[in-house]
Amino acid sequence: MRSAMGALLLLGSGCFAGEIPLRFAITDSWAMPMVQTEEGRPIQGIIPDVMTRLAAQVGMPAQFHVLARARLDNAMNHGEVDVRCYVTPEWVKDTGGNYLWSVPLFFQRDVLVGTASSPKVVTPATLPHQPVGTVLSYTYPTLQPLFDGGHLRRDDARSQEQVLAKLLAGRYRYAVSNQWALDWFNQRHPPDRQLRAVAVLQERGLGCYVRDDQNIPAQRILRTLLKMKTSGEIDAIIQSYTGHKESPQAGSDSP
């Protein structure tokens, strides 16, 4: 997929020379299969592949801005980027901004992760006081009451990849991850070193939102995303990385 992504990036940067770019936000804490970045730019992954295809179909060059999670809201508010994907309104602080939302395009399952020696099923509320691996600036609604009450304690890392690596290294007994990142992480380790989901924390559909600005073809972007979803194009991109079809729940309700 890396060579294909490189070709798409060249297409996006060369075929529309001189035109206004469509600026996409990429979160620096994401891990594969969502995105892999090198020298501040994405080189492969589900999200940049979808974004590049979207920009090409809209007729604009794709431009990527890799940002810290804490900077994403301000970047959208200040017009530094035009489109943000793999997101739900719950994660956006300024919900009163002039934004337009797509239908759900992706399905995310957040899981509590343990090691091969962990119990097969865990109830978070019954765990003794201990740190849990989390990603800096990420919110975890299911676990938040346990964090607030001091029952569990966040141990933040800058990326999802780092969270899982610290779990495997024994820095803590449990961590939080989405299913995609967990499956990708496990592909690089033998069975006795693989991590496993011990509890499902939350499942939800995620989409994209666009700045409602006269200089951006927002409605055309949303129509194109809908077409890409209903035609199976987005699901085919996901399957090329994950090896399995996307859950039908992703397109069932608006975010």
Indicate residue ranges for each PLM-predicted region.
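Extracytoplasmic small-molecule ligand-binding "clamshell" domains
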Residues: G18-G97, T134, D156, I221, ...
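Hydrophobic/proline-rich hinge and linker segments of small-molecule sensing/allosteric domains
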Residues: L22-D28, W101-V122, L136, C208-R211
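Periplasmic-binding protein-like
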Residues: D28-W30, F106-V111, Q187-L226, H244-P255
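Ligand-binding clefts/hinges and TM-proximal coupling segments of bilobed small-molecule sensing domains
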Residues: P61, Y138-L152, R158, L226-P255
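Short beta-strand-to-loop elements that line the ligand-binding cleft
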Residues: P61-A68, H151-K166, A199
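Short helices/loops that flank or line small-molecule/ion binding pockets
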Residues: H65, A70-D82, A125-T126, E161-W180, ...
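A ligand-binding cleft/hinge motif common to bilobed small-molecule-binding domains
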Residues: N74, Y86-G96, R173-Q202
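Flexible hinge/capping segments at coil-to-helix
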Residues: G114-V132, A218-Q219
